[in-house]
A protein has these predicted regions:
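Bacterial N-terminal signal peptides
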Residues: 10-17
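EF-hand Ca2+-binding helix-loop-helix modules
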Residues: 25-36, 41-60, 75-82, 100-106
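C-terminal segment of classical bacterial N-terminal signal peptides
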Residues: 17-23
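Blade-edge motifs of beta-propeller repeat domains
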Residues: 68-70, 91-97
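Acidic carboxylate motifs that coordinate Ca2+ or other divalent cations, activating on Asp/Glu
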Residues: 42, 62-66, 89-91, 111-115
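N-terminal export leaders
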Residues: 4-8
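EF-hand and EF-hand-like Ca2+-sensor regions
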Residues: 60, 78-85, 99-136
Length: 136
């Protein structure tokens, strides 16, 4: 028969091994900026992949399905100033073309080596994180 002390120590020992928490989904996303973006699995993000992700996000954010995003739908992805600058036609909303133009601008800023693709280290910069906010 196992003593109560032995049973408790066994539970604590197993608990100690198992107590290292698994990463949460948000931690995984932070650790892997490419999660779901690098569709050709080449380890980089190109402008086409970025624009496809941005277009898909645009469609998800367009809650009222009017083909544009207002400040509420964009949320914190853009500051009020950035939103106003991107709103070329000054209608108070962003069309998909206006949204994708911002994505292209941010992609070019994040592409510090000007190779036309973004590596993980480029996505972890301030400019890279600003781009990722428009993609996820």
């Amino acid at each position: 028969m196992i003593s109560r002390r032995t049973a408790i120590l066994s539970i604590l020992a197993v608990g100690g091994v198992l107590s290292d928490p698994l990463p949460t989904l948000s931690q995984t996303k932070r650790a892997d900026p490419f999660l779901g973006l690098d569709t050709d699995n080449d380890g980089t993000l190109d402008l086409d992949e970025a624009q496809k992700a941005a277009a898909a996000l645009f469609d998800r954010l367009d809650i009222n399905h009017d083909g544009t995003l207002d400040r509420h739908e964009v949320g914190s992805r853009l500051s009020a100033r950035e939103f106003a600058a991107a709103d070329v036609d000054k209608e108070g909303t962003l069309t998909k073309d206006e949204y994708l133009a911002i994505v292209e601008q941010r992609f070019k800023v994040a592409d510090t080596d000007k190779e036309g693709t973004l590596m993980a280290k480029e996505l972890q910069t301030k400019a890279g994180r600003a781009l990722v906010r428009l993609l996820k």
